[in-house]
């Protein structure tokens, strides 16, 4: 398969699917293990924050690692370390007993997993242009299918996570997660693709830190990238607590792990359909209109969810949010891929990712205590109303018009 025109692209897609499934399981499993101990949303937010705080630095390092060490190598190393971090949960339970897997241990392991994950994701994304060209696909088509497959992993992952927790327990579920990462390693290990191996050192700065700064400067002085990064930073900070703390808290209080999996699956199913449909939608909607629709819809949906309606309505709203947000990642990927030179591609992807995650820990710090003190309804509103405001502000951002002007350097 590696010698066929589509072989490299299919291997990248398979790796994205299995790694996404592994991460999807952890979204359910880590908060569930914490909330089983004492039911505290604060503790759950601490572990969720531990799983996001390292992303700010890790994505910067990941981008540099991809450019300096090579995309294929970094992808495999990242997935191996991610597999070890989640496998450590059942290993510690076997050696020291279940009580050893406490909130502090889970926070450390979640942090380690979060530190390793971005490198693999960045490496796979930066290989897409060459893989798409070899397969004869347009970049929009490749990005939409890639994000759809990644979302499919997040559909399978939470579903497996909820079922495994109900049948095997939260700790043993981590074995399945480790296995998913190993499948990704196997796929990339047989990949052969131009630009995926050793990098061209002649176009790189000697110092890695200087290379990271070079990536930061490129993003900051490219107006469309700077605007996208700021919008994503705010949206991530407002949305992440809902998925990582508020939904787990709501369904844990009701002892409904399977229903939590359904909600996360609804988000991912919507995202899958939205990402798959983007290649067609892009013929009729501008990138700017697509993005504005996504941000405004997310704010409206979060506001309705704040009133904790019946589960069927929550599922519908989550599916809608996933659908309108599905094309956003392909749009971001396209703009990064078509504005950044090849030797800077990894660092630009890393910088954009790190800025998106910068607000996540702050949102989690605030959401956990607020949920314990004021309740889920007030916390949802505290997140949804600023999201609505972001949608209104985005309408008047002139740089977003450049989304439809991006072209290959």
UniProtKB/Swiss-Prot annotation:
Claim: Cell inner membrane is one of the keywords in the record: yes
Stretches that traverse the bilayer: 10-30, 46-66, 80-98, 104-123, 144-168, 174-193, 218-240, 260-282, 289-308, 313-335, 348-370, 375-397
Keyword terms: Antibiotic resistance, Cell inner membrane, Cell membrane, Membrane, Transmembrane, Transmembrane helix, Transport
CDD domains: MFS_MefA_like (cd06173)
Record entry for activity regulation: Efflux activity is inhibited by carbonyl cyanide m-chlorophenylhydrazone (CCCP) and reserpine, but not by o-vanadate or chlorpromazine (CPZ).
UniProt function note: Efflux pump that contributes to intrinsic antibiotic resistance. The pump uses the electrochemical gradient as a source of energy. Confers low-level resistance to tetracycline and to several aminoglycosides, including streptomycin, gentamicin, 2'-N-ethylnetilmicin and 6'-N-ethylnetilmicin.
Annotated family: Belongs to the major facilitator superfamily. Drug:H(+) antiporter-3 (DHA3) (TC 2.A.1.21) family.
Record-given protein name: Multidrug efflux pump Tap
């Amino acid at each position: 398969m590696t010698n066929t025109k589509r072989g490299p692209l299919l291997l990248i897609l398979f790796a994205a699917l299995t790694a996404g499934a592994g991460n999807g399981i952890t979204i359910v499993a880590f908060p569930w293990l914490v909330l089983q101990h004492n039911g505290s949303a604060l503790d759950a937010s601490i572990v969720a924050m531990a799983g996001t705080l390292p992303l700010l630095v890790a994505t910067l390092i990941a981008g540099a690692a991809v450019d300096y060490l090579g995309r294929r190598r970094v992808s495999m190393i990242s997935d191996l370390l991610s597999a070890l971090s989640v496998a450590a949960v059942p290993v510690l339970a076997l050696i020291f007993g279940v009580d050893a897997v406490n909130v502090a241990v889970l926070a450390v392991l979640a942090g380690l997993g979060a530190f390793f994950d971005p490198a693999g994701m960045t490496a796979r994304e930066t290989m897409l242009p060459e893989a798409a060209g070899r397969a004869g696909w347009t970049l929009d088509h490749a990005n939409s299918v890639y994000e759809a497959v990644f979302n499919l992993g997040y559909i399978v992952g939470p579903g497996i996570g909820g079922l495994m927790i109900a049948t095997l327990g939260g700790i043993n579920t981590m074995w399945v997660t480790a296995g998913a990462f190993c499948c990704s390693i196997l796929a990339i290990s047989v990949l052969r693709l131009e630009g995926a191996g050793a990098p061209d050192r002649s176009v790189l700065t000697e110092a890695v830190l200087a290379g990271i700064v070079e990536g930061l400067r490129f993003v900051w002085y490219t107006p469309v990238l700077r605007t996208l990064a700021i919008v994503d930073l705010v949206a991530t900070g407002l949305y992440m607590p809902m998925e990582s703390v508020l939904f787990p808290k709501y369904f844990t209080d009701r002892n409904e792990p399977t229903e939590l999996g359904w909600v996360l699956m609804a988000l991912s199913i919507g995202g899958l359909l939205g990402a798959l449909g983007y290649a067609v939608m892009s013929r009729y909607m501008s990138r700017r209109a697509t993005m504005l629709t996504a941000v405004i819809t997310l704010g409206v949906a979060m506001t309705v969810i704040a009133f904790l309606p019946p589960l069927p309505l929550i599922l519908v709203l989550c599916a809608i949010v996933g659908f309108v947000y599905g094309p956003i990642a392909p749009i971001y990927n396209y703009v990064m891929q078509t504005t950044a030179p090849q030797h800077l591609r990894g660092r630009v992807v890393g910088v954009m990712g790190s800025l998106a995650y910068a607000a996540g820990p702050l949102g989690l710090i605030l959401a956990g205590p607020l949920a314990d003190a004021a309740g889920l309804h007030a916390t949802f509103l505290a997140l949804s109303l600023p999201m609505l405001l972001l949608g209104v502000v985005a309408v008047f951002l002139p740089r977003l018009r450049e989304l439809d002007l991006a072209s290959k350097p």
